[in-house]
Amino acid sequence: TLTNEMKTQTVYLSRSDNRLDLETDTTYNRYIPVGTRPYDSVVVETGASVKVLGDNGTEFVFTEGQEGSYFSNITFALEMGVDYTLEITTSSGTAYTSKKVGLKGTSEITNVYAERATSNSGVDGVAIYVDSEPGLGASEYYRYTYDETYKIVAPMWAPVDFKLTNYDPCALPEPTYDLEIVPREVQNQVCYNTVSSNTIELASTAGNPSSKVSKQMVRFIGRDNFIISHRYSILVKQLVQSADAYSYYKTLKSFSQSEDMFSQVQPGAIYANVSRKDGKDENVLGYVEAVGVAEKRLFFNFEDLFPGEELPPYPYSCSLETAPESHLSYCYAGPTPPESCPPSVIE
């Protein structure tokens, strides 16, 4: 996705793998990037030559950073009225080119807000909505992405720590040491995590004379989801798409939501806008698009929407365990008792 933001633009290249591993390919973990692990059915394309050409004579060269990810050598932003083409030459010499793409329009997000709501499945939670107005050009088709950041507070945390000095684990008959309880030097009770969206959220105002977006939900979070336990922030991006790009993502979303491959409603084929330069027939997946981006950030606390209510449960089971202070000398030559679990404090 190329944008009108002045930034380092990025192109991702990979190849599909015919191998199917039902265990690894059907198990999703939101905290592990999909597609870049050795056992995923995706092989990143390395060593390629990548550039973007504008019909106004501009040329932007990309250099591979991490494997399969190519970054523009300079920051640039797409311009209205200019059509762009992505050109790729693989390390084996095969050349690909995209159809011409250009900005269709821009928009302005006028409001991002959260309301307590109930989902279609009856779950109590928070709905995050967007209102926007059209800007330049034709703004009728939209895609939404977001980055959410949330505060994590460790439930069992102490402001003190152990300080161990003069420790001799091999002393006989018992280890020798000095152990003090001191204030904790590192404040690690509170931390923050940021997660990017992994769903396809679309909206269309085609047929609406005003082209305004009103109360478009981009995220729903269940009331028991710990990410809203304390402080929560979401940066919403609204991408103005072309009709073709909107159709592509709509079909892709249909595939991702089709739970039964034998259901009566079958998603259509996914057509890419990239092909081989030599005209040879080859299935190419993916889509190069040019979008106008608008963004806005929202903050809220759990108390803002659920005043006086109990916080969501912490996602991990934490329990207090008692450990012995010392241990058997490492140089003890007699019968060895079973190791303690958890290990001793001084270990």
Locate predicted features:
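A sequence/structural signal for flexible, mid-protein segments enriched
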Residues: 1-347
